[in-house]
Amino acid sequence: MNPKELTDLSQLCIHTITLKPWNIEEAAKKFSAAGVKGITVWRDTLEGRNIKQTGKMLREHGLTIVSSCRGGFFPNKDAGKRQLAIDDNRRAIEEAAELGTSVLVLVCGADPSQPLEDSRKQIHDGIGALAPHAAAAGVRLAIEPLHPMYADTRSAINTLSHANDMAEAFHSPWVGVAVDVYHLWWDPCLEKEIKRCGEHGNLLAFHVCDWKVPTTDLLLDRGLMGEGCIPLKQIRGWVEETGFNGFIEVEIFSNTWWKEDQSEFLNKIVKAYKAHV
């Protein structure tokens, strides 16, 4: 059953990377003018800026800072490099707290020079090392399972079932899951695993875009909602059946859309959100 229609923008969040050509100040101004209520901030947009002041600026534009992207990339054969990743994730947690958001999304990483099982253990150990720091900072860690095509270098966590297993292993309110339709729409167990995620209180974030047919780039050819084959309304229905009523985050990496006029693209995002999500 499809959920109720989205008639306003009260739950619409857009990731800064979706409109990558804009700096964060321009994004804040344009999002606010369009009636968008939430923003997820990618860490690269904060470089060279006072993070606390940037958070204040975003809130002054009426934007809720939904989450920060991204932490993770824990696995490496080299123990020294694994420690560098932990250190960077600690900084990411501190940045999220300073910015004024309570969620840090984790793209967990993988090392193709070692077995996936080793990468998965290193992800578990990395999150375990960070969880006390996250709790002290008031920042929840959202494990984002990625499509299996990214199991080589981007993430060894590739199904929602696996992300649920890992989150539940910590028994912590500070470790949960981010559900991104681009990575999970194909999974025959998706409805069941979304329900499970909600039952354990672990559903921290919901990301939308579309899967284009054909897809011409495995990373940078995501579609605007309605351009592809993902059953967005159905999946949103499953998410909302868990009791989730948070922001719906538009996350689109697209060389095609980044070449377009970004103000026009923003208008299309708003229309597609109402029509197809």
Each PLM stretch: what is its role?
Residues 74-76, 224-225:
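Short clusters of hydrophobic/aromatic residues that line enzyme substrate/ligand-binding pockets
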Residues 37-38, 64, 102, 140, ...:
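Residue-level detector of anion-binding/catalytic polar loops
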Residues 47-57, 114:
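Active-site-adjacent beta->alpha loops and helix N-cap segments on the catalytic face
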Residues 40, 67-69, 105, 142, ...:
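Conserved beta-strand positions in the central sheet of alpha/beta enzyme cores
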Residues 30-48, 69-72:
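N-terminal substrate-binding region of glycoside hydrolase catalytic domains
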Residues 1-35, 100-101, 157-179, 183-277:
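Histidine-acidic metal/acid-base catalytic patches
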Residues 18-20, 43-45, 71-74, 108-112, ...:
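Active-site-proximal loop/turn and secondary-structure-junction residues that shape catalytic pockets
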Residues 2-5, 25, 60, 75, ...:
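Active-site acidic/histidine proton-transfer and metal-coordination neighborhood
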